[in-house]
Amino acid sequence: MIEFVYPHTQLVAGVDEVGRGPLVGAVVTAAVILDPARPIAGLNDSKKLSEKRRLALCEEIKEKALSWSLGRAEPHEIDELNILHATMLAMQRAVAGLHIAPEYVLIDGNRCPKLPMPSMAVVKGDSRVPEISAASILAKVTRDAEMAALDIVFPQYGFAQHKGYPTAFHLEKLAEHGATEHHRRSFGPVKRALGLAS
């Protein structure tokens, strides 16, 4: 992996999202400005960490970061805008929520939302840039907790296990029980379950 070269600036925020692929729930984003004086060991892409490690790092990030913020776009916004534009909106909300304005924003992936400060997309940033790794961890822990809470209300769908992704089990239960109000109606499998697909 090519080592990432930072822009020449002090306050850098990392931004990442979780939940573009699921059929249910919000897309959740996070923005994090780390404190160089308080380094956090073991930051890595949230998908490569155990749940226990993610939870521990999540608390450490919240405690040590100069600033952190969560953003989200709800299922109805995803349906109205499409998943890409809703994700960009959620990223804008996360950056706007930082109580310290960053001088530069690094975003995981290959495109940036419109922001009031310079920004750059970093492919595989969640494993190359600690600020993005930290954002990835916060977003994933937050969204996983939301799916666990939804699982208590709708136990028949198994949200705590598959986190809303279109697994065979989820698709089977969607066909059997129909969609909840938290499902994304613009997504093909949900449309089909509701009889809306042409």
Curated annotation (Swiss-Prot):
<feature type="binding site">
    <location>
        <position position="108"/>
    </location>
    <ligand>
        <name>a divalent metal cation</name>
    </ligand>
</feature>
<dbReference type="GO" id="GO:0003723">
    <property type="term" value="F:RNA binding"/>
</dbReference>
<dbReference type="InterPro" id="IPR012337">
    <property type="entry name" value="RNaseH-like_sf"/>
</dbReference>
<keyword id="KW-0255">Endonuclease</keyword>
<dbReference type="InterPro" id="IPR001352">
    <property type="entry name" value="RNase_HII/HIII"/>
</dbReference>
<dbReference type="GO" id="GO:0005737">
    <property type="term" value="C:cytoplasm"/>
</dbReference>
<keyword id="KW-0378">Hydrolase</keyword>
<dbReference type="GO" id="GO:0032299">
    <property type="term" value="C:ribonuclease H2 complex"/>
</dbReference>
<keyword id="KW-0479">Metal-binding</keyword>
<dbReference type="Pfam" id="PF01351">
    <property type="entry name" value="RNase_HII"/>
</dbReference>
<dbReference type="GO" id="GO:0043137">
    <property type="term" value="P:DNA replication, removal of RNA primer"/>
</dbReference>
<feature type="binding site">
    <location>
        <position position="16"/>
    </location>
    <ligand>
        <name>a divalent metal cation</name>
    </ligand>
</feature>
<dbReference type="GO" id="GO:0006298">
    <property type="term" value="P:mismatch repair"/>
</dbReference>
<keyword id="KW-0963">Cytoplasm</keyword>
<protein>
    <recommendedName>
        <fullName>Ribonuclease HII</fullName>
        <ecNumber>3.1.26.4</ecNumber>
    </recommendedName>
</protein>
<feature type="binding site">
    <location>
        <position position="17"/>
    </location>
    <ligand>
        <name>a divalent metal cation</name>
    </ligand>
</feature>
<dbReference type="InterPro" id="IPR036397">
    <property type="entry name" value="RNaseH_sf"/>
</dbReference>
<comment type="similarity">
    <text>Belongs to the RNase HII family.</text>
</comment>
<feature type="domain" description="RNase H type-2">
    <location>
        <begin position="10"/>
        <end position="198"/>
    </location>
</feature>
<keyword id="KW-0540">Nuclease</keyword>
<comment type="function">
    <text>Endonuclease that specifically degrades the RNA of RNA-DNA hybrids.</text>
</comment>
<dbReference type="GO" id="GO:0030145">
    <property type="term" value="F:manganese ion binding"/>
</dbReference>
<dbReference type="InterPro" id="IPR022898">
    <property type="entry name" value="RNase_HII"/>
</dbReference>
<keyword id="KW-0464">Manganese</keyword>
<dbReference type="GO" id="GO:0004523">
    <property type="term" value="F:RNA-DNA hybrid ribonuclease activity"/>
</dbReference>
<dbReference type="InterPro" id="IPR024567">
    <property type="entry name" value="RNase_HII/HIII_dom"/>
</dbReference>
